[in-house]
């Protein structure tokens, strides 16, 4: 999959906090960024657990100036040496997920709006991909499993 062409899709804005770094899209304001990142990266702030397995997906409500925005957070763990090396060489899975979602969106395929990725500054720390919650959506894997 090729990345979106320069200038295509939403502009990503990098951010850097004491324990976290990442990129956000213009959909997220920066005025309360530190507080929102603290909430996003705390699974205890989850409104609901969506999936618990290899990765953890949970629903949060972002507090934006225009009101609340329901978002899904996917947590990627980097516990093993292999995951840490992979993150070092290829970037975090959260960063790759954001770029893949932007590429899918740029290709005209309907996908939940990508909002951000956040990663720990610690090599073994977690990373998080954040997108808009689509309550009427479905996971593509169920569609492909039904075809098999």
PLM regions with names:
Residues 34-148:
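Conserved ATP-binding subdomain of kinase catalytic cores across diverse folds
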Residues 1-47:
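Juxta-kinase regulatory segment immediately upstream of eukaryotic protein kinase catalytic domains
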């Amino acid at each position: 999959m090729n990345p979106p062409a320069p200038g295509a899709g939403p502009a990503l804005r990098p951010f850097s906090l004491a324990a976290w770094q990442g990129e956000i899209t213009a959909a997220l304001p920066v005025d309360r960024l530190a507080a929102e990142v603290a909430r996003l990266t705390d699974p205890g702030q989850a409104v609901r657990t969506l999936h618990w397995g290899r990765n953890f997906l949970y629903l949060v409500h972002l507090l934006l100036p225009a009101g609340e925005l329901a978002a899904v957070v996917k947590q990627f763990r980097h516990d093993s040496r292999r995951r840490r090396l992979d993150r070092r060489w290829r970037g975090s899975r959260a960063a790759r997920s954001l770029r893949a979602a932007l590429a899918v969106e740029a290709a005209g395929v309907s996908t939940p709006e990508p909002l951000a990725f956040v990663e720990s500054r610690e090599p073994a720390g977690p990373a998080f991909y954040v997108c808009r919650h689509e309550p009427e959506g479905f996971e593509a894997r169920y569609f492909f499993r039904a075809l098999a």
